[in-house]
């Protein structure tokens, strides 16, 4: 579990490193504001007003998608307080997806899909649209919006204005895009100009199906019993009880966890973590995954990789 946790931590940290891309987008935005190609008053009101910025950002986003082991990348423009928005509002957006990031990239980008982008960008960018393609991202005021709303709103409401990456957050709940059946988690951070204006969100996506390939549960025990859980908690890791929210999982615990609505409570006994599932004791090994700096707004959401093997399976060799 320790080695696998180190590997997952490296993957997630590499995915969330967006400094170069966010700097480019911020500088491009500022230049377009200075020469009046863009206006902050209308930036998020229609795709045509934001089109110059989306057209400039999209090629760099594609480069970043290619250079990282991620399944998606997105840019969402918004200059307004989300608490004042209504369900159905449309936000200018470019959302690119690669269903198989580990495969050799196509020279003509035939492996990339546009989930969301204005039709003018689709025509010039020469990338196919997915079946649920939309010209703008529809704000629905629900769980499916949390992946981009939380980082934006936290920065928007913070008068101190830290660096944008400090507001970055990984979603603890998988989401689906409207009309799409792929479950994903995302890391998103706000876009902030030098004067403190928060004008959008930049982020990366990892499909649940892709994360599963990075959690080979059969390595946990020789007889191919066990499960990996990628989870988060706000509990004290030094305590005797851990309330977990499971974000991704592979192995034998998938169905029972689904029935438990992905919530799990671990107890500690003799320095060993365990929980009961369907009347059987499961032994858990836990390693923390460091994703946030200590003072970041979401540092209280601690990420863990949990390896699980049933007690009977774990000790079967000695019986």
Whereabouts are the PLM-identified features?
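Juxtamembrane extracytoplasmic/periplasmic/luminal helical "stalk" adjacent to the first N-terminal
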Residues: 1-57, 69-71
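Extracellular/periplasmic juxtamembrane segments that couple receptor/chemosensory ectodomains to their
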Residues: 181-204, 208, 250-319
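Short, hydrophobic-rich beta-strand element in sensory/regulatory alpha-beta domains
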Residues: 62, 69-82, 225-231
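GAF sensory/regulatory domain recognition
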Residues: 77-138, 233-236, 240
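Tryptophan-centric aromatic hotspots in well-structured domains and transmembrane helices
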Residues: 72-85, 94-97, 154-175, 301-303, ...
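Extracytoplasmic/periplasmic ligand-binding sensor regions of membrane-associated signaling proteins
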Residues: 116-203
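Solvent-exposed, extracytoplasmic
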Residues: 56-61, 197, 201-248
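Short regulatory alpha-helical segment in sensory/regulatory domains of signaling proteins that mediates
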Residues: 9, 27, 59-68, 178-179, ...
């Amino acid at each position: 579990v320790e080695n696998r946790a180190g590997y997952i931590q490296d993957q997630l940290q590499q995915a969330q490193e967006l400094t170069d891309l966010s700097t480019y987008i911020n500088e491009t935005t500022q230049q377009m504001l200075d020469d009046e190609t863009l206006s902050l008053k209308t930036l998020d009101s229609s795709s045509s007003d934001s089109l110059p910025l989306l057209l400039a950002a999209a090629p760099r986003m594609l480069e970043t998608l290619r250079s990282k082991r991620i399944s998606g990348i997105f840019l969402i423009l918004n200059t307004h307080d989300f608490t004042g928005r209504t369900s159905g509002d449309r936000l200018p957006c470019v959302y690119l997806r690669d269903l198989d990031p580990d495969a050799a990239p196509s020279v003509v980008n035939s492996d990339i899909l546009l989930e969301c982008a204005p039709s003018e960008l689709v025509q010039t960018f020469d990338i196919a649209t997915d079946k649920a393609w939309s010209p703008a991202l529809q704000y629905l005021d629900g769980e499916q919006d949390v992946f981009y709303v939380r980082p934006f709103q936290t920065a928007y409401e913070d008068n101190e204005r830290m660096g944008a990456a400090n507001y970055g957050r990984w979603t603890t709940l998988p989401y689906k895009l409207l009309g799409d059946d792929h479950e994903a988690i995302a890391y998103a951070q706000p876009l902030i100009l030098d004067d403190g204006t928060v004008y959008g969100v930049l982020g990366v996506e990892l499909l649940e199906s892709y994360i599963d390939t990075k959690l080979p549960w059969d390595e946990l025990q020789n007889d191919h019993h066990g499960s990996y859980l990628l989870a988060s908690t706000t509990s004290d890791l030094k305590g005797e009880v851990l309330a977990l929210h499971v974000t991704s999982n592979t192995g034998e615990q998938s169905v029972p966890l689904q029935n438990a609505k992905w919530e799990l409570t671990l107890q500690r006994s003799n320095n060993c973590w365990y929980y009961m599932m369907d009347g059987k004791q499961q032994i858990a090994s836990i390693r923390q995954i460091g994703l946030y700096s200590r003072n970041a707004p979401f540092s209280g959401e601690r990420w863990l990789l949990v390896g699980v093997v049933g007690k009977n399976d774990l000790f079967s060799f000695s019986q």
